[in-house]
Design a protein with these regions (language model features):
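N-terminal glycine-rich flavin-associated loop
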Residues: 83-102
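A generic local secondary-structure boundary/capping motif
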Residues: 106-108, 127-129, 143-147, 156-160, ...
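Alpha-helical interface subdomain recognition
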Residues: 1-81, 136, 218-360
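Cytochrome P450 C-terminal beta-domain/meander region
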Residues: 125-140
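A short, Trp-centered hydrophobic/proline-enriched beta-strand micro-motif
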Residues: 112-123, 157
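Residue-level signal for inorganic ion chemistry
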Residues: 20, 74, 119, 157, ...
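Flexible, small-/acidic-enriched active-site or ligand-binding loops
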Residues: 126, 145-146, 171-208
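A short core secondary-structure module
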Residues: 120, 142-177
Length: 360
């Protein structure tokens, strides 16, 4: 099996890494991440114009990529720079629409970066319900911690029903929708989206009868792969930063990297990162396959591995830096927070371990 990237994919990765290295230092990232909107619209526009969102979708959806390895390459680069712009929402909402083969105008806006989309998946304390109203539906309830909910102009909303989930495309300015926005601990913004007797027409539905679960699986599967790849990119950054610190920081007249105890701890970190990277490569390979069960198992394995490894890498790299690793000004502290919080998106390591076993 050949896991080497194509020339086009290498070019995409090089372009994105270079753009982020030159134009997205940690100070720029933090200014947007901890600001009112949780991201920088100018950065989003710049990266969209480079075709980064388009790389996440195939030609049928208006993009030029869309494979599992395309998603992996893009999100590894985004994770390495700790990007907070709303790529995950674009990927998941866009994948749902593309899987259904509907709402082409909205999908085109998402792929071009002109439309900010959010995938409203996890229910809050008041689960979202949809009751039939005429030819359409009436939505009530709350979706919790929806990434970039305040900036989104459109939501793709999932509603659990007996037999098959209902998926709906809902403009953010629809009467009855309210968003309580907030910054999240690792940087970026999210919001609780409340639907109060929101009336939708029949054209709001994404997909037909019996298609709901496949649409949700397509969106969530892409999200799991993206988060796992993002974590690998973040781990690669903190690995390099920590190795540099061990070489430069001196104690008793020698670099602390000469101390065997620290060498052993760093060696463990390196091995765990390689194992996590392998799990993500396996998931990216299975993502485009015809075997749905193998794909879901590979995604569950990757997300489980990322959750376990991400926490270890965050803790160890902070410990190896000492006090400076916790400071706001030092980038590693922000990466550590993100690595811990990735585990809690779309199911944590315990959930995905149980899921992997169940799929076996």
């Amino acid at each position: 099996m050949n896991f080497e990237h194509t020339d086009d994919r290498r070019m995409l990765a090089d372009t994105l890494v270079r753009a982020l290295r030159d134009g997205y230092p940690i100070e720029t990232r933090n200014a947007g991440a901890y600001g009112e909107t949780g991201y920088d619209p100018a950065v989003w526009q710049q990266l969209s114009e480079l075709g980064i969102v388009s790389a996440l979708f195939d030609e049928a959806a208006g993009g030029f990529g869309g494979s599992g390895f395309d998603i992996m390459v893009v999100f590894e680069a985004l994770g390495r720079a700790l990007v907070v712009e709303p790529f995950l929402g674009a990927l998941m909402a866009g994948r749902a629409l593309a899987k259904a083969g509907e709402h082409d105008e909205t999908l085109a806006g998402i792929v071009s970066g002109e439309t900010i989309a959010a995938f409203a998946y996890d229910d809050g304390m008041t689960p979202v319900t949809a009751t039939e109203s005429g030819d359409g539906w009436m939505l009530s309830g709350t979706k919790a911690v929806v990434s970039q909910a305040g900036a989104a102009s459109v939501f793709v909303v999932t509603v659990e029903q007996d037999g098959d989930p209902l998926v709906l495309l809902v403009p953010a300015d629809t009467a009855g929708i309210s968003v309580r926005s907030f910054n999240v601990v690792e940087g970026g913004a999210a919001g609780d989206v409340t639907f109060e007797n929101v009336t939708l027409g029949a054209d709001a539905r994404v997909g037909g009868d019996g298609q709901g679960q496949a649409i949700v699986d397509a969106a969530v599967g892409a999200g799991l792969l993206a988060l796992s790849a993002e974590a690998v990119g973040a781990m690669e950054f903190v690995k390099e930063a920590t190795l540099g610190y061990l070489r430069d920081r001196k104690q008793f007249g020698v670099p602390i990297g000469k101390f065997q105890a620290l060498q052993h701890r760093m060696a463990t970190v390196l091995l765990e990162i390689e194992q996590a990277h392998s799990a993500v490569i396996n998931a990216a390979s299975a993502f485009d396959g015809d075997d749905a069960k193998a794909r879901e198992r590979a995604l569950a394995a990757a997300k489980y591995t990322i959750g376990r490894t991400g926490a270890l890498v965050a803790e160890e790299t902070i410990q190896l830096h000492g006090g400076i690793g916790m400071t706001w000004e030092y980038a590693v502290s922000h990466y550590a927070k993100r690595l811990v919080m990735i585990d809690h998106q779309l199911g944590d390591e315990d959930y995905h371990l149980q899921r992997y076993i169940a799929l076996g």
